[in-house]
Amino acid sequence: MFAVLNYIDRNNAAAARLKGFEQDLNLTDTEFQTLLSILYVGYILFQANRSPFQNRIGRPSLYLPAAMVIWGMISVLTGITKNFVSALLTRFFLGIIEAAFLPGALFILSKWYRKDELSLRYTILYCGNLISNAFGSLIAAGVLANMDGKLGHAAWRWLFYIEGALTMFFALVAIPMLPDFPHNTKRGFTEEERQVAQLRMLEDVGELDQDSREEKWYTGFVLAMSDWKIYILMLSLTACVTGLSFNIYFPTLTKTLGYGTTETLLLAAPPWVFACLLALLNSWHSDRTQEKFWHSTWPLLMGIMGFIISMATKPTNKAARYVALFFQAGSYAGYIIMYTWMSSSFPRPPAKRAVALAFMNALSQTGNIAGSYVWPAKYGPTYVKSYGVVLAMFVTTILLNLWFRSILVAANRRLAEGERAFGEHNDTVEQAAKLESTTVRDAKQMQKGFRFLI
């Protein structure tokens, strides 16, 4: 539910656009695109330090709901904006506060679940994004159709009021329900259950999922920044996020089918339900087979097929273009696998993983900034040029993922060699530590049966 509301509050401007948002605030097309992109500027600037901070304070049960209350309040305030500048400020601060959620949620899951269980759990989390597009469209359809002029407020303003209030309500309800980390959570688990949770992580990699007491606060940052695998995956994620920018404009793309506001929002929901089901099935199979590259690639190829159909057909061909929207939405199944691949590729120490998750997720959001300007109204209603850009981004993503996979294959080969030499040649272990940008202590633990998922 946190994820659903996170993305609803982030993307509701796209639905508000259909019912006078631009006209009432006297926005140009470029100004509207800037309102979409400025959220990700705040997101990027303030996200990289959030997971390490959460790792240090160890109380996500309080940290995440507090952030949720604040971003819900900011969403409500968006409804009272009068011009471009006031809307720009609310969107910027919304990005700052929402930056706490995703890396924090990913990090919590990585503390409770083993690497062979993460794909399905991450997918359930990311289905919040997919369902938010469907659920948010249905809410918007009802609000925009029935609330116009109520108490003297435009329907799009009511959309921000209602969705922001829902966010704050669920945040307060969630406080007594959320756990902390396995080693310090107090609610909902017996001491035996906490020990079992910690032992599961011990079996997964060969050590408890806790930072060494001797490690300095900046150790995780240094280890993460010196691991060049992070930069490859970051570029891949950035290209993929740019390719997924159709999500921001999905109501606009659906409206090119030629229907009214209510019908458009209702038609925008089914592709995301399909995407959610596809993502769950794909992630379940990825966990079962312990394979990442192909499970991230084939949904992107399906998305490319959707782009090609949209480029090759005219707006009058409603059936083909609507099917293409299903294919495009389904490409999210590959993006989700990329995130689980990211987490499992930087397992220990937790401080390094926290920095890696936050850094890659934050900088990959530059793709959303760029993507906000890929879909100008002048390219409509066919958006051929826009589809050409996102198609190229998906191809780039696949090629970078192939490179990343080859690096992990080589790393697994080195780990196997180091495992055979373990206890005989300390220099081999030290070399492995240097190659994997980690400490000698962690390299020794990783030698004990650990392999990167490819």
Task: List the predicted regions and their residue ranges.
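Conserved MFS/SLC helix-loop-helix module at the cytosolic interface between two early adjacent transmembrane helices
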Residues: 45-85
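Central cavity-lining transmembrane alpha-helices of secondary-active solute carriers
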Residues: 37-52, 269-281
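Intracellular terminal tails of multi-pass secondary transporters
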Residues: 1-11, 19, 29, 175-210, ...
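Extracytoplasmic gate region of multi-pass secondary transporters
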Residues: 14, 219-283, 372
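Structural signature of the two symmetry-related core transmembrane helices
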Residues: 62-76, 294-309
